Amino acid sequence: MVVEIMDTTLRDGEQTSGVSFARQEKLSIARLLLEDLKIPRIEIASARVSTGEYEMAKQLCEWAEKRGHIDKIEILGFLDKGASIEWIRSCGAKVMNLLCKGSEKHCTFQLQKTVQEHVEDIKQTIKKAKEVGLKINLYLEDWSNGIQHSPQYVFHLMDALKNEAVERFMLPDTLGILNPLQTLKFCRAMRRRYPDLRFDFHAHNDYDLATANTFAATLTGIQGVHCTVNGLGERAGNAPLTSVVAVLHDHVKATTGITENMVNKVSRIVESYSGIRVAANKPIIGESVFTQCAGVHADGDNKNNLYYNDLLPERFGRKREYALGKTSGRANIRKNLESLGIELDDESIKRVTQRVVELSDKKEMVTPEDLPYIISDVLKHETIAQHVKVINYTLNLSQGLKPVAIIAIEVNGKTYEGASTGDGQYDAFVKAIRKIYKEQLGRTFPSLTNYTVNIPPGGHTDALVQTVISWDYNGNILKTQGLDADQMEAAIQATIKMLNLIEDKAVSYTHLRAHETGAYL
């Protein structure tokens, strides 16, 4: 079974609140749809909208003509005494999707015409369009209401037009009111009454049933369906292209010709152009949908792929990921280590897992990019004795005033308090500790020689921060690091690790020698 997909991202999708594609964005999306995804048909505009829309449509049609795609370009037209026909013809397009009324209410109250008058207008428009070489598809706007509440109107309209030069009769669920059982019933009625006609189904997602209704429509033999990238469209949107393609391929066993492994790329580009973010859990294209969080799932994947289904991420140009968090367990850690090419013994994996759990209490998810930093943090500091601990600290930052740090630390079991101002919050923190060491402990405090902040790639504001600080202690260089989602906390961790190194006399020589090998602590 072949199901023809018509993408209306550039027409109906642009009717999403707050979305307006620039001309070059529309041209870019059209190229992606036709040449990367291999969409059979795309609806690019509504006739007579604006001068800018006309220039875009004309430029796109010129490109499509050169690339052999011109018959795949469609433009929405209206019953306006031939004005839409001329607009579309002068753009260079070959197909007009003519909007007529698919319910008696729309015909009576919006057009204020009888069905006979409406039929005559449609026939005259079809005749004019054919005279200038345009092909016609016919939208029955509000068909879902019409077939439920005024079926005789719908059948009267269809009986009068079934022998006209119409390529496709397109059945919109304009207000998104149908459920799958109703879609089956009404589409089947149309197919049985008019078996020789070609029908498209056009879903809207008001009840979150657009994909299910599209699926139901194809079960009745409907030959074409309409979608948009990321489900863009009026109100709750249209049927999302990626979900519809997957359902047609896997559940209908239909052929669409769509290149599945390009859908994620196209989705991301349209997301960027539209400014409408894709939900993380949106099927197939959401950021998290191919991420296993539970450790038992990762363990099952290690044992004959027990938690796989037909929606393999590679089908859609993506990769499976294993989340690092409090529920992930060692199986998830192992999966991520494999992907990074890192091998650790069981005891090290146990320590890394414990650290991931600790971090996940502060951060919703630890990313794979964070993992090398965590490993370095855990394995390089596992033997440092905890002679110095931070009991509490307060950092104040106020407009026009110097930052203030108030701290309480424990050194060898005894608590000390200190406070200081500084040029920054960390500077104030270090000066407060230096006061404690000099004034209360009578000890030398190392001087800071270098301070480096590393943030894993990805650009997330909640990414783990690795802070590496170099210290000069009596002519010896120490290098310590901290790791946290908060940059200040990471710097404080690095500072406390340094203090523990110099406090632990038994291991100080060993750690000081690490500098000579290029290692950092």
Give residue spans per PLM region:
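N-terminal capping/small domains of soluble enzymes
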Residues: M1-D80
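A mid-to-C-terminal "edge-of-domain" accessory segment
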Residues: V2-V3, D7-T9, K253-A419, G459-L464
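Active-site mouth loops of central-metabolism enzymes
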Residues: T9-E25, E74-D80, F109-K113, D142-P151, ...
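Non-catalytic terminal/interface segments that mediate subunit docking, oligomerization
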Residues: Q15, S20, I29, E369-L478, ...
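Alpha/beta enzyme core
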Residues: R23-I39, E86-L98, G102-C107, E120-K135, ...
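Alpha-helix-loop-beta-strand connector modules within alpha/beta enzyme cores
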Residues: E53-I75, E120-E131, F186-F199
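Mixed-charge, glycine-accented linear interaction segment located at domain edges/termini
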Residues: I477-K479, L483-A506
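Conserved small/polar residues in nucleotide/adenosyl-binding loops
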Residues: T510-T517
